[in-house]
Amino acid sequence: MPHHILCAVYGLMPSISVVTCRVLGMLNWKNYGSDFDTKYWLVKDACGLFTCSITNFFIFGGAYVTNVYGLKEKSTMNMIHSVIVCTLLFLGAISQWQCMLTDPGAVPLDAVPLKAAAATSNTCNRCGTFKPSRAHHDRVSKRCVVKMDHFCPWVNNCVGFYNHKFFILFLVYVFLGS
């Protein structure tokens, strides 16, 4: 059933209705993308989504191997090691998802330069929007990104101004957990 019908059905209980509508709205694939009119950020690149899935497989596979084979000998040190590694890998997976689902700093369609910088304003040749200084066009998401570092296929997103922290945390947690 479409989520607006469920919202009408649960109209008598507003708190359940709001939660149900939000969850079902978030599960709708049409709400995700890197276009100007999407509600939630997600780069819909098949290769990137596959690579991101492989990354999750290795993270959770590492946690599984640590728990199954690391705890064959029952000792306190093995238990502590397993808890630390699984915690770090879980935090790495959370950081990966935050990096993947966070807008990296894409320039909005209606962005205009400041009055002081209007004389030297640039326009992107590929997407036609205002291009601030230190912004670069990302070929995969087809958007200009402020302080773009690179496109990372392991998180299926461009690393930019708003998700740089999550990317560094992802690297640190996976490095320490491996």
Give the ranges of each region predicted by the language model.
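Intracellular leaflet-associated regions of eukaryotic membrane-associated proteins
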Residues: 1-178
